[in-house]
Amino acid sequence: MAKITQTMMAQVLSLVGGSGNVAKCGNCMTRLRLTLNNSALADHAALKKISGVMGVVESDAQLQIILGPGKAQTAADMMNALIESGDNVAPAVSEADLSTIAAQQKKQMKSKQTSAVQRFLSKFATIFTPLIPGFIAAGLLLGIATLLEQIYVVGQTPSEFMLDLVAYLKVFGKGLFAFLSILIGYNAQQAFGGSGVNGAILASLFVLGYDPEATKGIYSGMSEFFGFAIDPRGNIIGVLLAAILGAQVERKVREYMPDDLDMILTSVVTLLIMGAVTFLIIMPIGGELFKGMSWLFLNLNDNPLGAAILAGLFLISVVFGIHQGFVPVYFALMEAQGFNSLFPILAMAGAGQVGASLALYARAKKETTIRTQIKGAIIPGILGIGEPLIYGVTLPRVKPFVTACIGGAAGGFFIGLISYLGLPVGLNTVFGPSGVVAIPLMTSADGIFAGMAVFVGGLLISYTVGFAATYFFGCKDVDLS
């Protein structure tokens, strides 16, 4: 795969309209995310031809350039450096461009509702992506600790060293989840246009304790809010609601606040308003929403058909860049079950891609371009990074993308069926890698080995069905050159 270079980023910047057309540059695990002032200036066809670019996705004013794992952060750093240097400015808009821009605006108006949803959900990438490496690290360490515990502690006479090692490996996950709400509150309020620290403070209201007799946690110093009982329910849903609404309140307060008093009073007024709203409205409503979301997805996950639908449609959400919208559901399931039972179901979608791509490889002749593409993308796909296969192999050919979704649905059906029969499995953390890398992170009510076995079974079924469906039904009239 091509290396991210300064020259490559300068080329990308030129093709999106120059530095003057980039309002914001960020990234997720695999994508460079550019918020453009005028999306009509971006040359999608030319961007896709750049060596190292695996695909381009547009979500309203945000252009997402797929670069692959380990490269998006480097690309974002280089891009921001180029923008700050001011070496590349946006080209002037000529009269010839006006018809193109008008057509683009018409297209945006027609898809206003869809774009608004996409725009909202895409912000979840900004909230949760910086936390994903921590989720993965804590999950892997917890998986290793649980494995050691099963082998050397349960039913054994463990050494002091082994007990200390297990406790040490688990402590990072406990630390992450103890204060995770504060991190999410910070990122959420910042993502929606407010000050991150205000979001963190509002999120801390859900972490503090309100029972003076409690022996655990940090007592807030108050047990009621002006006569109203305080029940810090809602968990991540409540935190997100408080931070998102808090950002809107902060922006509105700032509109009316004199510049000289902005730094001193804007946050004060915002916190006073949002503290009351959080205690009186958001905590009760967030609690009910949290329970409802948990109930819905627990029932979907325990239903083979529901699990198949979720797994089969997940790749479509990846294509539109809105798959981060599932993250709040992950939190709800962690709270309800102690593990994330939705994640292994959705992970089957990537396995279906692997099976479909292997079928295309088998059908294609030697020394063809598609074989070269698959060779470069299949290992990341097996390891859980599916975007190279999606944008480089299956999606451009359409039929294999559909049969890959069928393969994912088959694996999802299997995991849902096992759950329906009484053995739900899930990830031991909120978010983690998919593919074979996720195997040691799997757990269940019957222990980690049962969880790992069910997950591997689902992967094998998705590989097999994705391969068979593509080999027999997904290759006709498809470019295999």
UniProtKB/Swiss-Prot annotation:
One of its GO terms (molecular function) is protein-N(PI)-phosphohistidine-sugar phosphotransferase activity. GO terms for biological process: phosphoenolpyruvate-dependent sugar phosphotransferase system. It is found in: Cell inner membrane. The chain crosses the membrane at residues 124-144, 165-185, 190-210, 225-245, 263-283, 307-327, 342-362, 376-396, 406-426, 448-468. CDD domains: PTS_IIB_glc. Keywords: Cell inner membrane, Cell membrane, Kinase, Membrane, Phosphotransferase system, Sugar transport, Transferase, Transmembrane, Transmembrane helix, Transport. Pfam families: PTS_EIIB, PTS_EIIC. Residues 122-481 form the PTS EIIC type-1 domain. It is a multi-pass membrane protein. The EIIB domain is phosphorylated by phospho-EIIA on a cysteinyl or histidyl residue, depending on the transported sugar. Then, it transfers the phosphoryl group to the sugar substrate concomitantly with the sugar uptake processed by the EIIC domain. This is PTS system N-acetylmuramic acid-specific EIIBC component. The gene is murP.
